[in-house]
């Protein structure tokens, strides 16, 4: 009897936690009116995670613990859309919008319909998806794909905070109804600040070009835990399946907000072209101040009965259209071209421009990408050039106004030597860019490595800015990141703009950085292709720098998410002549060259075994199961090979299980795995 009361109390606590967590999630992300701190929110979530781990029977399909991620999927099965997800026809001028409005008016008048109100919404630059809810609970999420068939990415969409896992109770005349299947369509996107933060965690050569590319790549990641940390958002713009099929589109957007969705809030019911044109003009100016990218305005007839009347072509509906904002452009004069050297030696041409206003800010520099792009443009010093900003953080030069070329225009002298150290530059076969091979002696590369080492996502050394690093390198005070930890206050006080207080702050910040994790240090070392996520995997698989240095290319490639290219890059880094001295300095500086606080093994049942998980586990997510193996002396690998010691097969295990059986490897079930714990 006592046991039943306890079970009821635990079930009620879990239900209350789920309601509270989703309420606070909605307040934070959708309404931007948080009521509690991040710390208190995390405590609620951790308590629910604890309850569900101790009592798996309490887990529900709409539990917010699913947002944390952890499930790993091998593939994204195809799904058929209930109705085709058509793309919209584009227009690029107000004149074309007027033509669309007139055309729609004629078609409706032919049917005896005079009302033609339109809803104007911002067009988000993201990835279109469809969400299916059954009895108010999210059951499926899919990409648009080819319009008729997309990919099932439910496991990843569950991690997006603005995707409600259960629809909120609706006190509204536009009820969703009981037992109904409701479809919500919208766009998954990444905010500007989150895009910048993500790129900051990635090696220079692996950075995303824009937020849309980052979003598309993230949605197809196989590890939902990695999707969760990338902070995607979902904006809803379509609702189908409500009780009254004639509910106007404007009211459907309001209903989506009531149900817990983020709509952006910037939509308007327009009575005619004058109001449409005003909406377009307003957001052409104000869009640059939004926290996300928007590249236009979508116009839809408000009366959904007219949607059926007008129908659609094979590609797009006749009742809606997208107005695409022209990329913001400005004309200015090219003053000079300078060549920058990155921390990995890549040489990038940068245009220095006569300052000009563009998209709400003053622009004086612009990227030219690489030498081939410069040749394509035919650019010369003194030219009038057109620069463009269409969502990118850095504007780009798109063309030269050759008819305005001055008589004294000069050719751009392409360097044959590194502008920082005069070493002859080289170009690898198949590569677009040139680079400086003087890794050890090039001051520009050293400056880049120091700044990367000190950056927020690496060792997070406060007060170590670009101007100070430039002086440290120029005066020979640092030759690698290890030298930072042996700087003395008197040395720093002698530098420009460095008084006693500033010098003291730098030394204190360096000392505080010693407490950063081993995984952060691995990222800070700046190994080519090793971003934050890869550094974490390396730290798990090789718990000390000595173990990592001793690992062969094959052993490295066997680690989760590390293939032969990254493995080769790691080996090449350790084999570089200067690395041995750097590691010695880091040891002397008492930096974390091993995993923090190694715990004594709970048992040795997995000691020395390389373990592969395949299929879905019932009682563990992939991350927690991996931790259990690591705590017992094992190592997690992602691929099956002759060296694999153990394969744990869950539900729907696929090709990895087949390969393991062919190789005669030891394969166990989840029950046998738990017995080994």
UniProtKB/Swiss-Prot annotation:
It is an enzyme of class 6 (ligase). The keyword Ligase applies. Its cofactor is Mg(2+); Mn(2+). DNA ligase that catalyzes the formation of phosphodiester linkages between 5'-phosphoryl and 3'-hydroxyl groups in double-stranded DNA using NAD as a coenzyme and as the energy source for the reaction. It is essential for DNA replication and repair of damaged DNA. The keyword Magnesium applies. NAD(+) binds at residues 38-42, 87-88, 121, 144, 187, 300, 324. Residues 601-677 form the BRCT domain. It comes from the Bacteria. This is DNA ligase. Zn(2+) binds at residues 418, 421, 436, 442. It comes from Chlorobium luteolum (strain DSM 273 / BCRC 81028 / 2530). The gene is ligA. It catalyses: NAD(+) + (deoxyribonucleotide)n-3'-hydroxyl + 5'-phospho-(deoxyribonucleotide)m = (deoxyribonucleotide)n+m + AMP + beta-nicotinamide D-nucleotide. InterPro entries: BRCT_dom, BRCT_dom_sf, DisA/LigA_HHH, DNA_ligase, DNA_ligase_AS, DNAligase_adenylation, DNAligase_N, Hlx-hairpin-Hlx_DNA-bd_motif. Belongs to the NAD-dependent DNA ligase family. LigA subfamily. The active site is at residue 123. One of its GO terms (biological process) is DNA repair. GO terms for molecular function: DNA binding; DNA ligase (NAD+) activity; metal ion binding. Its EC number is 6.5.1.2. GO terms for cellular component: cytosol. Keywords: DNA damage, DNA repair, DNA replication, Ligase, Magnesium, Manganese, Metal-binding, NAD, Zinc.
């Amino acid at each position: 009897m006592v046991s039943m009361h306890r079970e009821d109390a635990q079930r009620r606590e879990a239900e209350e936690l789920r309601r509270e967590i989703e309420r606070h999630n909605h307040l934070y992300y959708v309404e931007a009116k948080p009521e509690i701190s991040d710390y208190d929110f995390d405590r609620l979530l951790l308590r629910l995670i604890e309850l569900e781990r101790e009592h798996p029977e309490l887990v529900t399909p709409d539990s917010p613990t699913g947002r944390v991620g952890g499930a790993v999927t091998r593939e994204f099965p195809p799904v058929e859309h209930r109705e085709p997800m058509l793309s919209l026809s584009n227009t690029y001028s107000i004149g074309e919008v007027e033509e669309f409005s007139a055309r729609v008016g004629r078609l409706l008048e032919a049917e005896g319909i005079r009302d033609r109100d339109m809803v104007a919404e911002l067009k988000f630059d993201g990835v279109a998806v469809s969400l299916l809810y059954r009895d108010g609970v999210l059951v499926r999420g899919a990409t648009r794909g080819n319009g008729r068939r997309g990919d099932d990415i439910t496991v990843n969409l569950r991690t997006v905070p603005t995707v409600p896992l259960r629809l909120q109770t609706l006190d509204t005349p536009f009820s969703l109804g009981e037992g109904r299947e409701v479809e919500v369509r919208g766009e998954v996107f990444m905010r500007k600040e989150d895009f910048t933060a993500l790129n900051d965690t990635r090696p220079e050569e692996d950075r995303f070009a824009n937020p849309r590319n980052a979003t598309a790549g993230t949605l197809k990641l196989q590890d939902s835990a990695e999707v969760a940390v990338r902070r995607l958002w979902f904006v809803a713009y379509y609702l189908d399946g409500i009780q009254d099929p004639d509910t106007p589109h404007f009211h459907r957007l309001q209903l989506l907000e009531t149900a817990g969705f983020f709509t952006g809030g910037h939509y308007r019911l327009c009575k005619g072209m004058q109001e449409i044109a005003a909406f377009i003009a307003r957001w052409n100016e104000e869009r640059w101040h939004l926290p996300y990218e928007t590249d236009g305005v979508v116009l839809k007839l408000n009366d959904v009965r007219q949607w059926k009347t007008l129908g659609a072509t094979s590609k797009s509906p006749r009742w809606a259209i997208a107005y695409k904002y022209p990329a913001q452009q400005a004309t200015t004069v090219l003053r000079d071209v300078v060549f920058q050297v990155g921390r990995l030696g890549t040489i990038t041409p940068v245009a220095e421009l006569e300052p000009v206003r563009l998209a709400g800010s003053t622009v004086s520099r612009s990227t030219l990408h690489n030498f081939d792009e410069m040749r394509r443009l035919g650019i010369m010093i003194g030219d009038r050039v057109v620069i463009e900003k269409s969502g990118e953080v850095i504007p780009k030069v798109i063309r030269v106004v050759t008819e305005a070329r001055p008589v004294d225009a000069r050719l751009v002298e392409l360097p044959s030597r590194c502008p920082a150290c005069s070493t002859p530059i080289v170009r690898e076969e198949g590569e677009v860019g040139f680079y400086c091979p003087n890794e050890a002696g090039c001051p520009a590369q050293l400056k880049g490595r120091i700044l990367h080492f000190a950056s927020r996502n690496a060792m997070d050394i406060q007060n170590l800015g670009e101007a100070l690093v430039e002086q440290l390198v120029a005066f020979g005070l640092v030759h690698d990141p290890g030298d930072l930890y042996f700087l003395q206050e008197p040395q720093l006080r002698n530098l420009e703009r460095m008084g006693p207080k500033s010098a003291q702050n730098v030394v204190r910040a360096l000392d505080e950085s010693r407490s950063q994790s081993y995984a952060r240090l691995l990222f800070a070392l700046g190994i080519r292709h090793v971003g934050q996520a890869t550094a974490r995997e390396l730290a798990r698989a090789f718990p000390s720098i000595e173990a990592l240095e001793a690992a062969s290319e094959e052993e490295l490639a066997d680690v989760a998410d590390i293939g032969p290219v990254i493995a080769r890059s790691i080996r090449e880094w350790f084999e570089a002549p200067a690395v041995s001295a750097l590691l010695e300095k880091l040891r002397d500086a008492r930096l974390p060259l091993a995993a923090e606080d190694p715990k004594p093994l709970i048992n040795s049942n997995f000691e020395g075994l390389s373990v592969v998980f395949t299929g879905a586990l019932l009682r563990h997510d992939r991350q927690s199961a991996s931790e259990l193996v690591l705590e017992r002396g094992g190592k997690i690998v992602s691929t099956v090979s002759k060296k694999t010691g153990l394969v744990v097969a869950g539900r729907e295990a696929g090709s990895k299980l087949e390969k393991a059986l062919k190789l005669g490897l030891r394969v166990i079930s989840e029950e046998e795995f738990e017995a080994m714990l």
